């Protein structure tokens, strides 16, 4: 899981360990039922996740808390992965915004075109050249951390550019009319859509390909992908949390993106309107289920055994409720980490390790037997201690299964391949 953005200047990501996309349910690529695994799936990889049954990754620029206000967060004590000196960009976790990776084309608020404005007007070669230079300046050659590309100005699917993003549709159609004034409105829209989507695909796909080629050990993916579009509306009389109708078909059309990604980073940011509501769990649940569905169907390159990590982005605050880390905010954050979040992560990590040892001989991580089932590592105080408690072995065996780390096989991950583990 990644802890993510503060509203304006900061990303506050906390990344928790890769979620499992293995299931013993009947095969399907629709809904929440995921494919049957004949053999235990190989656990999602990446050196930062290697041999870790559970991981939380910090991506908040809290270096300023110590440097400016002498407020220190002892993240290492709680086994939370952090960049050196808690820097925003580092070798464990980094994020690239629109103006910090190549020449990303977008329309400014006043309508002017930046780097061509539209994907079909961008200079892909110049973009890739600059992007590679920027990556080399920021990342070490052996970089093996989390690498997130955060481009949110437009979507690669035409119909998902609604609201203010419809300007990309309007200007794309205007471009076609200038080139082909003989076409009807329907023909103009169809051609504009095709050119936009083809160019958007090429831009995103080639960016990922280049990044993975130069830093193959990194976990590369786009923030907010796959999407679910399940925000609760004021008009909703009953909220199920399910993804918007047509979401799965749209995400299936992005198979080219999933095949180039080495990690998926769905957003589970909670809006203020869901504070204290059980609907928050429904929203998060279905966003993660859709990401797991995508990860279960497509794999990076030709790797058909190792799962793509699903690393949800979460905030420590509700969206748009914080803007800047002043001394007071830093103190509140420190207290929250030291008294609530840190102990919870520590206790949950302990249970995950215990499950790994009991079920998987310490050579894999535990995953629910059925993703839609309710058993979890956390429960009520009658069965466990106050935080995450200590489940007995029977609970683990009845509700969880193993995803073996690379180099291990078998239902209990007890068969080792020394050559693979080197």
Name these PLM-found stretches.
Residues 353-363:
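Disulfide-braced loops of extracellular cysteine-rich modules
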Residues 2-5, 10-51:
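N-terminal signal peptide
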Residues 79-81, 131-134, 242-255, 285-297:
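Alpha-helical scaffolding within the catalytic cores
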Residues 222-255, 271-277, 282, 320-321, ...:
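Non-catalytic scaffold segments within catalytic domains of secreted glycoside hydrolases
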Residues 253, 259-260, 266-320:
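Glycoside hydrolase catalytic-domain groove-lining segments
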Residues 149, 264:
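Conserved, mostly hydrophobic/aromatic
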Residues 113-117, 161-197:
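A solvent-exposed, charged loop/short amphipathic helix patch at secondary-structure junctions
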């Amino acid at each position: 899981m990644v802890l993510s953005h503060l509203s304006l200047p900061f990303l506050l990501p906390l990344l928790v360990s890769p979620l499992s996309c293995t299931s013993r349910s009947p095969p399907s690529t629709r809904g929440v039922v995921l494919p049957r695994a004949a053999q235990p799936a190989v656990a999602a990889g990446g050196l930062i996740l290697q041999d870790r049954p559970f991981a939380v990754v910090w991506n908040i620029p809290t270096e300023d808390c110590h440097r400016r206000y002498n407020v220190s967060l002892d993240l290492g004590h709680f086994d939370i992965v952090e960049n050196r000196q808690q820097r925003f960009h580092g070798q464990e976790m980094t994020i690239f915004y629109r103006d910090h990776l190549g020449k990303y084309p977008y329309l400014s608020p006043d309508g002017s075109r930046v780097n061509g404005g539209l994907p079909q007007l961008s200079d892909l070669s110049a973009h890739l050249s600059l992007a590679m230079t920027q990556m080399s300046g920021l990342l070490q050659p052996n970089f093996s951390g989390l690498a997130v590309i955060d481009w949110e100005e437009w979507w690669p699917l035409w119909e998902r550019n609604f609201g203010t993003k419809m300007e990309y549709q309007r200007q794309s159609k205007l471009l076609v009319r200038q080139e082909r004034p003989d076409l009807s409105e329907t023909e103009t829209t169809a051609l504009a859509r095709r050119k936009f989507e083809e160019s958007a695909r090429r831009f995103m796909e080639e960016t990922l390909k280049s990044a993975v080629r130069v830093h193959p050990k990194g976990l590369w993916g786009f923030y907010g992908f796959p999407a679910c579009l399940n925000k609760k509306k004021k008009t909703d009389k009953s909220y199920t949390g399910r993804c918007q109708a047509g979401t799965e078909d749209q995400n299936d059309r992005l198979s080219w993106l999933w095949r180039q990604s080495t990690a998926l980073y769905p957003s589970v940011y909670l809006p203020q309107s869901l504070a204290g509501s059980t609907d928050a769990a429904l929203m998060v649940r279905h966003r993660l289920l859709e990401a797991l569905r995508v990860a279960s169907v497509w794999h990076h390159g030709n790797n058909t055994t190792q799962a793509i990590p699903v690393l949800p982005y979460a905030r420590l605050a509700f969206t748009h409720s914080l803007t800047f880390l002043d001394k007071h905010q830093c103190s509140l954050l420190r207290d929250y980490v030291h008294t609530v979040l840190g102990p919870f992560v520590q206790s949950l990590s302990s249970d995950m390790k215990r499950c790994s040892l009991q079920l998987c001989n310490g050579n894999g991580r535990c995953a629910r037997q059925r993703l839609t089932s309710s058993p979890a590592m956390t429960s009520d105080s009658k069965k466990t201690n106050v935080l995450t408690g200590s489940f007995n072995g029977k609970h683990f065996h009845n509700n969880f299964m193993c995803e073996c780390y690379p180099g291990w096989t078998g239902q209990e991950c007890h068969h080792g391949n020394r050559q693979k583990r080197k």
